[in-house]
Amino acid sequence: MNNIKLYKECYFKNVAVVTGTYCSGKSMVAPIVSSLSKVEHLRKLLVVDQIFHLANLRMINKESAIFLVRHYLDKSFYEQLIGRNINFRIEDETSIFTAKNTKELANRILIKRGEHVITKHIQNKTIFC
């Protein structure tokens, strides 16, 4: 059997990860981080936590976990940039109504998707939270 190596280059290099155990203050710190200049609106990506749990339990290997996380983050960040999966629930922590740039986030559903979206945010050094 051939040893297949999984590798995924990330489109986005600037990522701020707010992590910690339950009740450690993540919900208080993450909105502060996402309010900073060039930082995108807060997203909670529970799949990433689940992938790391599987890796820690040795149910998947480290190489697979890294590949899956990179792939999922790129997909999630791109979808955020084109306005896909926007949270419009007013009272939710990740709602666009709690963002510093609500109108800009809402208008993303109107932009044309494609590689130019990624290029723009790489050049602007956007930080994803």
Region spans (language model):
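An N-terminal structural lobe/cap that precedes and organizes the functional/catalytic core
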Residues: E9-C10, S35
